[in-house]
Amino acid sequence: GKVLMIDGDKVELENYGVLYLDDNFHVYTTYGIIEETDIENILVGYNITDFVIAGKKVCAAVISEPMVADNIRVMIMTTGFTSLFHERVSVKATGDYIVKYGDVEEVHKGTEIVDIYPESGYLSMGRISITTVNKEDKITILNVNKSYGNPSYRGDIEIALYDEGLVIINEVPIEEYLYAVVPSEMPVRFGVEALKVQAVCARSYAYKQLMNNSYGKYGAHVDDSVNFQVYNNVEEKDDSIRAVKETYGQVEAFNGK
């Protein structure tokens, strides 16, 4: 299953929940040269790793294919970028949306608000996933304010409970992530050509940070602040979307990296 979180002694897999790692846990790659590698190379958000379970513990992980980066997982911080952890989460959407927890799927009208608290029954079975019925719609987070108001997000939203509070993760295609990074990092008045340069830089940085797996213990790659790249503080603009589309897949590299 897809890796949702990995920490020093446990891993969370989609549809399997949290599994603990054996004291003699090892990680191997089997594409190219077969060799042992580090746990840091198990990337969250991807399903390229097979896990070997014995006695209710994970004793090994086998990374069976190279990673092809398509999605990025972003932690959404509180208003003012003051914390990774939220006291509550309130959502609605621009169209019908689905809240999934455990084996339960609730369908809500876009205008219906769902409130989630740490003690909420929604969280009794682990992470919550929120998806729109129509992939063109967006999910709005009402407990966060950005420069343009309550932010709306492409892709899916996950909510997980930690000791410090709730974390919000937006899983989104990298190209669509850039739609809301480019205008947040550079004023669109600079024009499309300047925005195209920004798009290439932002894409390059996103790929690098995705591979670093910095927030693996929370199930994310980056957050939405200046710690990485500011994301969705300014809403998408036509010119920023155009700049991303016209540079699709282009990255900067130095010495092959």
For each of these PLM feature ranges, what is it?
Residues 1-257:
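Conserved, single-site charged/polar hotspot
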